[in-house]
Swiss-Prot record:
Keywords: Ribonucleoprotein, Ribosomal protein
An example Gene Ontology CC term for this record: cytosolic large ribosomal subunit
Subunit structure of this chain's protein: Part of the 50S ribosomal subunit. Contacts protein L32.
Gene Ontology BP, a term: translation
Protein name as catalogued: Large ribosomal subunit protein bL17
Organism the protein comes from: Staphylococcus carnosus (strain TM300)
Family recorded in the similarity comment: Belongs to the bacterial ribosomal protein bL17 family.
Molecular function per GO: structural constituent of ribosome
Classification via NCBIfam families: L17
């Protein structure tokens, strides 16, 4: 079995992973369940690899996954999540060959006891 179903249909799962990947790119650290974090790892690693290539085809491939979210910077300028991926995040990892994310276990969630985890960019 190549992936986790996460209790959703395929289109719901794809939408959830797109949302989580965009949130991780924008915030660089999010808290979610352990299964979602482990599944998100592969999605974000492939996006960063596309960002490292940096050509137009890679940008279009990444634009299929990353949501069109605007980010307000400290100097009151805005950029999209895709611009942050290609302009800030991908250049950090030019010397690293994969393994761009880290999953830390955070214990059970208070409401339902699900194992939560923090996923962050290394």
């Amino acid at each position: 079995m190549g992936y986790r179903k996460l209790g959703r249909t395929s289109d719901q799962r794809k939408a959830m992973l797109r949302d989580l990947a965009t949130s991780l790119i924008v915030n660089e650290r999010i808290e979610t369940t352990e299964a979602r974090a482990k599944e998100l790892r592969g999605v974000v690693d492939s996006l960063i690899t596309l960002g490292k290539k940096g050509d137009l085809a890679s940008r279009r491939q990444a634009a299929k996954v990353v949501r069109d979210v605007e980010i307000l910077n400290e100097d009151d300028t805005t950029q999209t999540a895709l611009q942050k991926l290609f302009g800030e995040i991908a250049p950090r990892y030019t010397d690293r060959q994969g393994g761009y994310t880290r999953v830390l276990k955070a214990g059970p969630r208070r409401g339902d006891g699900a194992e939560s985890a923090i996923i962050e960019l290394v």
